[in-house]
Amino acid sequence: MDINIRDMKFSHDGILKRALLDIDSWCVDKGERIFVYGPSGAGKSTLLNLVSGLLSCSEGEISVLGERLDKLNSRQRDRFRANHLGYVFQSFNLVPYLSAIENIDLARNFSTRKDRLSNKLNASELLDSLDLSSEDWKKPVSLLSTGQQQRVAIARALVNSPEILIADEPTSSLDQQNRENFMSVLMGLVERKEMTLLFVSHDMSLTQYFTRVQALNDFSKTD
């Protein structure tokens, strides 16, 4: 089991009666591809941030890959995330004046799992598999198209060979063609590398790609 949440509550203000998320039990098995949907403000991004350790729960247990995140301090959670999780953000979160390979380096340098040479080869392989030419690797990402920037974001999330990939509305800024291309590339990499995928989106047309589709309010008692 890759993700196991029990008796978990999260509140921004610490008042649990006004918990944004209240989950009795929720599990994700290894290799599952989970699509979570729900209205804006329901707590979908908060769920991802809790699972990735960007946030700490107010009460209860969050186990990811057998590690109790609720028992770790902020620095330990950051290290765990760098070593075991990949994150694709809605807004890409790329550094615009850095090249594609330099943006990937930022993620790689946080990980303690692999030496620089093996990661460098992995980064080159990823960029090549995502149809980015060696010339594109060297350009500031601000000069790349939206679709190319999204591919750089995927490569950055995957460069440390994460066991779990987390994606927060990653297709929201893409047109239909780029959205289809993105999903084809993403799912191909996820299946080839046998990763668990936790994906949040409003776009129900994407559900065909997933092994489980679940509304957030099916497992979270939110007001």
Question: Where is each model-derived feature located?
Answer:
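Conserved ABC ATPase signature
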Residues: 140-144, 148
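Conserved ABC transporter NBD signature motif
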Residues: 60-68
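Helix-to-loop junction immediately C-terminal to a conserved catalytic motif
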Residues: 52
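Catalytic Walker B motif of ABC-type/P-loop ATPase nucleotide-binding domains
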Residues: 165-168
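Conserved catalytic motifs of ABC-family nucleotide-binding domains
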Residues: 161
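Short coil-to-helix segment of the ABC ATPase nucleotide-binding domain corresponding to the Q-loop/switch region
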Residues: 98-107
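Conserved ABC ATPase "signature" region
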Residues: 68, 117-135
